[in-house]
């Protein structure tokens, strides 16, 4: 077997990899159905429960939660703080790495992650900055 034929499975995989993440203004189940080649990120909580806000798409097979909040309620214990920065970063990295491992093109909400119900910029600004830097890397806006 010649070297090109031997390397073709690897090369084919590289050439077929989606390039860069994209943003979309709003998600719907129909939109996700129309794009099975993409993985749609949404702001999630540590309990992986609730369907409010971006999590309305939670149960769709092309949706993937990125934890930005402790629980799906409005009490003080539901929100992250920078007191747990290292743990917050670990969860963000774990979720983003799992999304990237799918090999699908990543779709990020135009409004961002951690920007709505999670209130990261107010309650955990260092965590918010870290998450935004990771998202900018995915978008190629370093």
Model-based region annotation:
Residues 3-142:
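Macrodomain-like recognition of ADP-ribose-binding/processing modules
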């Amino acid at each position: 077997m010649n070297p090109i034929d031997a390397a073709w499975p690897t090369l084919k995989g590289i050439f077929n990899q989606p390039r860069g993440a994209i943003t979309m203004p709003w998600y719907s189940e129909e939109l996700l159905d129309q794009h099975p080649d993409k993985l749609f990120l949404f702001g999630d909580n540590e309990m992986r429960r609730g369907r409010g806000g971006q999590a309305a798409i939670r149960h769709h097979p092309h949706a993937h939660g990125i934890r930005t909040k402790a629980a799906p309620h409005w009490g003080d214990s539901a929100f992250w703080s920078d007191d747990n920065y290292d743990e917050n970063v670990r969860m963000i990295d774990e979720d983003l790495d799992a999304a990237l491992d799918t090999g699908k093109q990543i779709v990020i909400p135009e409004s961002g992650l951690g920007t709505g119900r999670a209130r990261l910029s107010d309650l955990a600004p260092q965590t918010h900055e870290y998450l935004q830097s990771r998202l900018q890397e995915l978008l190629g806006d370093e």
